[in-house]
Amino acid sequence: MANIKSAIKRVKTAEKRRVANVQRKSSMRSAIKAVETFATEGNKEQALVAFNTASKKIDKAAAKGLIHSNKAGRDKSRLARLVNAL
């Protein structure tokens, strides 16, 4: 454990950020899975709504640095193809 006051604060801050990042990433993954589920069921309306939500979460994750911008584009493109195929 750190002894210096600023280092102790950095440990606490890093833990808070880690927890927030895990939540954001998990939320993004859940949104992606929702689109895939609705698409496999053939439910275009719900898949489209879920795609819009997932797209927003993917963009936010890329902006926060949780995922690379190329991965964000790739994921959105893949989901868009999935929804448009319905």
Swiss-Prot record:
Pfam families: Ribosomal_S20p (PF01649). One of its GO terms (biological process) is translation. It comes from the Bacteria. GO terms for molecular function: small ribosomal subunit rRNA binding; structural constituent of ribosome. One of its GO terms (cellular component) is small ribosomal subunit. InterPro entries: Ribosomal_bS20, Ribosomal_bS20_sf. Signal peptide: none annotated. Keywords: Ribonucleoprotein, Ribosomal protein, RNA-binding, rRNA-binding. HAMAP family: Ribosomal_bS20 (MF_00500). Belongs to the bacterial ribosomal protein bS20 family. Binds directly to 16S ribosomal RNA. This is Small ribosomal subunit protein bS20. It comes from Exiguobacterium sibiricum (strain DSM 17290 / CCUG 55495 / CIP 109462 / JCM 13490 / 255-15). The gene is rpsT.
